[in-house]
Amino acid sequence: MSVSLYDYYGQTRTATDPFNLDHWRDDCKPHLPWADNHFLERVSGAPLNPGATYQDWRHGASAHSFTDENGQFNHTYMERMWPKWADKLGVLQTTDDYERQMLIVDPLRVNRGIRGEYGDLHDLVKLLVREPHTRQAYLPLYFPEDTGASGRKPCTLGYQFILRNQRLHCYYPMRSCDYANHFRDDCYLAVRLLLWVINQCRIADPLGPWNDVMPGSLTIHCTSFHLFANDFIALCQEESNLWTTS
């Protein structure tokens, strides 16, 4: 049983020091230190599966039930952000595993789409550096193979970045999000990705316009923004306790 929420979240946060992560930790209230450690896995450049930080997630014990006979998930954020070598290097828990496998992999075996090679998060940064005002800086996480397939599907459809008036904005569409268990982490990880992209553009083009670019808006669209009944009851009890003790 689930309880649907029909609330519209049209809030905008403006930080005087937007690159100060403590501000965003206080604002988003993610589950730490897991969220920070998992973010580093996501931007490591390696298509890790299963990775390591899932074991430290607060529901990590049940996550094992979603792995296959090799101990891998049917997808990870790391695979989707860095898909060029995904599923060609065996079980990858750490970047050390990835680096060892890359020493022996055939460079011609990179994953391809219908017409060309897969792009990744690094290619998105290169596109922004090359064409700062592009409308094409989109990183898909929901792949064609997910349509019609059984099993788990990515909740995140992708991330789009667009630069306007010296502010880099992020549009974050989701097919589904659990308010109680995932929303805070999803918001925080999206903000961290936005800050990371700006920083990577500055590194790639130190004399370009990116030193003057600041974070803009984070726009999240979620088709199914839901809350399960047991979580709804727990949140109501928590709210009641706050009123009682205040």
What do the predicted segments below correspond to?
Residues 1-246:
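Terminal, non-catalytic protein-protein interaction segments that mediate quaternary/complex assembly
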